[in-house]
């Protein structure tokens, strides 16, 4: 492999603020923020919007979208007039 062309693969903390969930894993993502982890070491921090702790599919708190009501409303508004 060529030298100095591959991104650094290092430990990184991903933080989901909506669920107050942090996970230490490895990644090549670039970030300027850092955080002190439970082991006392400082790691790069990546803030994410959704994780397995906050996504409706994984939490079981899915919202059912009322598409039937939307379709009926669309047909009333734009449908053919008899």
UniProtKB/Swiss-Prot annotation:
This is Large ribosomal subunit protein bL31B. It comes from the Bacteria. InterPro entries: Ribosomal_bL28/bL31-like_sf, Ribosomal_bL31, Ribosomal_bL31_B, Ribosomal_bL31_sf. PANTHER family: 50S RIBOSOMAL PROTEIN L31, CHLOROPLASTIC (PTHR33280), LARGE RIBOSOMAL SUBUNIT PROTEIN BL31C (PTHR33280:SF1). The gene is rpmE2. SUPFAM superfamilies: L28p-like. GO terms for cellular component: ribonucleoprotein complex; ribosome. The keyword Transmembrane does not apply. GO terms for molecular function: structural constituent of ribosome. It holds the Pfam family Ribosomal_L31. Belongs to the bacterial ribosomal protein bL31 family. Type B subfamily. Keywords: Ribonucleoprotein, Ribosomal protein. Transmembrane segments: none annotated. GO terms for biological process: translation. The keyword Transferase does not apply. Part of the 50S ribosomal subunit. PROSITE patterns: RIBOSOMAL_L31.
